[in-house]
Amino acid sequence: MNTVSHKYRQSALLLLTAAIWGSAFVAQQTGMDYVGPFTFNAARNLLGGLTLLPLIVFFSSCKKRTLPPDASSENGTQPKTLWAGGILCGIALFVASTLQQIGIHTTVGKAGFITALYIVLVPVCGLFLRKRVQPKVWLAVLIAVAGLYLLCMTDGSFSLQKGDLLVLACALGFTIHILVIDHFSPLVDGIKMSCIQFFTCSILSAVCMALFETVNVSNLLHAWIPILYAGILSSGVGYTLQIIGQKGLNPTMASLLMSLESVFPVLAGWIFLHQALSGRELSGCILMFAAIVLVQLPGFSKTNAVS
């Protein structure tokens, strides 16, 4: 099952996920010019869930035609496992995406790179869950962190503002999200779990929206393009690819691959928002790519999970 071709296929899915997420930072920051964080996340996750419903119906009908009448449509998986995974993922996603959206007022590139500090938090938290990490993978993590530093701290000093601290807290939320997916993705249908997580996150965001924000229809209409992009592509497509792509991969390797989402907002911010890309930031991008290449070498193919 853990063949080289399977590893590269899953890696390609996570790289595509990173590209989608990275470009979405621009949409998230633009959307915040018109609506609050809870409104934005309620709308984008509702769209994400609705995007997946036709796929679920289509694949379910295909399974019914191909499976024998007495076969289990969930391959032996209990529905409660699917719902537990989806709801827990949705709660983690709600916490992480809310903190990220509130803290998005920092520069697009900086927000992306601080968020990607989950590449350190995932292996550290994984140790408590008895998931070993090869020394060479730790080396790749250190190289990636060096790249993060070059891109985040452009003046050479380690200074964090209020918005940066919120985004840093969201990195812990995404760490929990990755580890929850690592646990449940081999057990359940990835598309169904993704759909449940979106509706869970949307409901939680909508409750907070009603309590803490005033919804303005005119502002919502002005933000419809960023919401559509973040909802359909970043949420509906991106997070679903994450669940499918993480299946069978070590969570630390998966987090390193997805950390390239931080390179894409820098490039997107440079292209669309005219945020300057210095030689220091370019060096950071190169180090990030080097770390990703390193974990793809043959010596990194082992899963190293302890049962």
Outline where the language-model segments fall.
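Juxtamembrane helix-entry segments on the extracytoplasmic side of multipass membrane proteins
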Residues: H6-S11, Y34-A42, Q78-L82, W138, ...
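Hydrophobic transmembrane alpha-helices of multi-pass small-molecule transport proteins
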Residues: L52, V133-M153, S205, S259, ...
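Hydrophobic/aromatic residues within transmembrane alpha-helices
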Residues: G31, F40, R44, G103, ...
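Glycine-/small-residue-enriched transmembrane alpha-helix faces in small-molecule transporters
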Residues: M1-A43, G90-I91, V95, L99, ...
